[in-house]
Amino acid sequence: RETWFLHSVNMYICLLIILTGLLVVVIVGIFRYEKRVWLRRNPKHSRLLLPSWNEGSKNMGVAISRVDDINYGRHVSFSWFDGRFITAGRHRVAFEYYEYYFMARRYNRKIIYKKEMVFNFKADTVYVIEVLQERQTFRITADTNNYL
């Protein structure tokens, strides 16, 4: 009787692990599909690498709040893990330099400063966004080491 109980518990644990794995695969698959669709619709695009780093219990980084007066640049850009893909051409982009305390009980992302910049993004080019904290601005440079 005890072995039957242990066998059924082990079976449920294995089933739970398998279902969790399938859920992760489905979520990753959806993200990859959405990326592929966006890249197919926007063949002339650039990539922006947005820096992010930890300082103790806080995360510092750069985010995009608007692209061409569109919140988060929906349809004009596509967010990916270490940055964004953006359609080639001239865009007005609002960058934010922020700090985020990940040990806090509630979400408290503090924007240190914002800067709106107009830039002409060339197709098939990777751009690195650098923080110039002393001047409270950003520098956009083409990265020759990374490729799309």
What is each stretch, according to the model?
Residues 1-148:
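Short loop/turn and low-complexity linker motifs enriched in small/turn-promoting residues
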